[in-house]
């Protein structure tokens, strides 16, 4: 398909501006407003907060059991990193380090809990989307389970839940190409963003690199993904969900718009360092 050019201009009249000098670094952050504070949660178990978006205070940073937001994951490391994300995982990290990336936090109005969706990742296409819950925005977030797997082959697919939703014939025909994962057509399970639509339904958009961006509905009562019925004509996969054309999301005039994660308009959200 072709591309469309838009004349997109923003007026800064009436908008307060200033320099951010607090030197808090949070990579791949999501932003949450709760209890009068703005929170950012990012890769490498980092988090910060601010009351005015200018002055930031570090809440957590670094891979450690003492991390007040993410540290509980080490208590269940055998489960949380079973597939990917550590040197002891089924698919080991390529640098033998722990990798927890790109969290997104949302308040679940049905359960009354804060949900953190994030990925553990080992290689450029072997990742696992997981989630945790907390009663407060600052955590600690208790690991609840794994949601979506990518990067497997015939030997490692047994370490995933893929065959709970599709049969072997479908999995081998679609998800595995030759001796490796079919990364050309299916996603790397990273970079989740969770949101409510105008009808109050909960969704997760995810994926990067590899085969594109996908969308799955979330069960509001559990926080788990809902695997849909296959619908090839509409690009709906029974495991990975609806294939989208582009990436991360924002709300514009009561519509959910999908924008490329690298787009200039959302670089400030997806790739900023404060």
Question: Where are the regions that the model predicts?
Answer:
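Carbohydrate-active catalytic/glycan-binding domains of CAZyme proteins
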Residues: 1-274
């Amino acid at each position: 398909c072709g591309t469309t050019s838009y004349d997109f201009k923003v007026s800064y009249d009436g908008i307060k501006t200033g320099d951010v000098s607090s030197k808090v670094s949070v990579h791949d952050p999501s932003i949450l407003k709760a209890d009068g504070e703005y929170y950012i949660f990012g890769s490498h178990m980092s988090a910060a907060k601010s009351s005015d978006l200018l002055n930031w205070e570090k809440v957590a940073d670094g891979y450690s059991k003492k991390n007040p937001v993410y540290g509980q994951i080490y208590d269940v490391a055998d489960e949380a990193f079973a597939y990917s994300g550590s040197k002891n995982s089924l698919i080991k990290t390529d640098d033998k380090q722990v990798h927890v990336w790109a969290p997104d936090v949302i308040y679940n109005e049905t359960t009354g809990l804060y949900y953190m969706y994030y990925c553990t990742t080992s290689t450029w296409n072997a990742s696992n989307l997981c989630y945790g819950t907390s009663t407060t925005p600052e955590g600690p977030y208790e690991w609840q389970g794994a949601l979506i797997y990518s990067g497997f082959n015939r030997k490692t697919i047994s370490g995933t839940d893929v065959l709970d939703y599709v049969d072997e014939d479908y999995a081998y025909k679609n998800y595995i190409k030759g001796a490796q994962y079919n990364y050309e057509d299916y996603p790397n399970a990273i970079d989740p963003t969770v949101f409510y639509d105008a009808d109050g339904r909960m969704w997760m958009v995810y994926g990067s690199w590899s085969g594109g961006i996908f969308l799955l509905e979330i069960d509001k009562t559990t926080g788990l993904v809902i695997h849909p019925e296959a619908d090839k004509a509409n690009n709906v996969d029974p495991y990975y969900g609806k294939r989208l054309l582009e990436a991360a999301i924002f709300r514009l005039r009561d519509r959910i718009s999908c924008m490329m994660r690298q787009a200039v308009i959302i670089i400030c959200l997806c790739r900023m360092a404060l």
